């Protein structure tokens, strides 16, 4: 029987996604257009992973930040409905909850994003003392050379000081560097998540499958 307080500890981004489908063009200045539907969801890779874990019947905790506003309240309610412990979720009095507007049509998508409380995200804020109370930690927000050293230091500390297994969702490298140093992290990762494009870039291989096989030689599992 698992004696840990939480099944999964997640730190990272949470925001509101407002999705507006069927947008073929934007209104001219001074004009107004109507849309048939506009939908609101909880977004952010870390938050979505946490919600998914909660819906599977596990007991996750989420550490992040929202604003003291209606969207922050919506997020907290969604977490509670999905059996997510929000005791580590900070409510900011300074910044508003992040919002991403998604304009979609059959051909493409465009986004407008206000980062809001997600501006404060930094992997150095992960509370290793809290991680000790979890069976597993899910890590997101890697940005290549921008925060590589911080990630390496954290993963080493987690392996040395806790019993938690580690999953790592790499994400897109906004710097465009795709540096091979990411492999330094793999020995400390039990489950490595990458999409096909990310795997091909980081693996410098012709196929994601070939890259995944190579990654799995040092990481526990590449998905």
Task: Enumerate the language-model features and the residues they cover.
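Glycine-rich phosphate/adenosyl-contacting loop at the front of the ribokinase-like
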Residues: 1-65, 70-81
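Short, surface-exposed, charged/polar-biased interaction segments
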Residues: 29-37, 74, 100, 122, ...
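Ribokinase/PfkB-type carbohydrate-kinase core domain
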Residues: 2-16, 78-91, 105-223
């Amino acid at each position: 029987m698992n004696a840990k307080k939480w099944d999964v500890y997640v730190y990272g981004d949470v925001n509101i996604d407002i999705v507006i489908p069927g947008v073929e063009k934007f209104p001219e200045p001074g004009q107004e257009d109507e849309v048939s539907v506009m939908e609101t969801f909880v977004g952010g890779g870390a938050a979505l992973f946490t919600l998914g874990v909660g819906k599977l019947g596990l007991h996750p905790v989420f550490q992040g930040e929202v604003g003291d506003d209606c969207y922050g309240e919506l997020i907290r309610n969604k977490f509670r409905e999905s059996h997510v412990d929000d005791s580590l979720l900070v409510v900011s009095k300074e910044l508003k909850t992040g919002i991403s507007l998604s304009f979609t049509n059959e051909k493409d998508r465009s986004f407008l994003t206000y980062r809001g409380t997600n501006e404060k995200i930094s992997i150095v804020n992960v509370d290793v003392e809290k991680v000790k109370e979890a069976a597993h930690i899910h890590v997101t927000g890697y940005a290549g050379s921008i925060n590589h050293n911080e990630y390496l230091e954290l993963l080493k500390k987690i392996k040395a000081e806790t019993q938690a297994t580690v999953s790592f969702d790499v994400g897109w490298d906004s710097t465009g560097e795709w540096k091979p140093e990411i492999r330094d992290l793999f020995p400390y990762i039990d489950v490595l998540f990458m999409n096909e494009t990310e795997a091909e870039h980081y693996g410098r291989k012709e196929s994601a499958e070939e890259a995944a096989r190579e990654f799995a030689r040092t990481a526990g599992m590449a998905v």
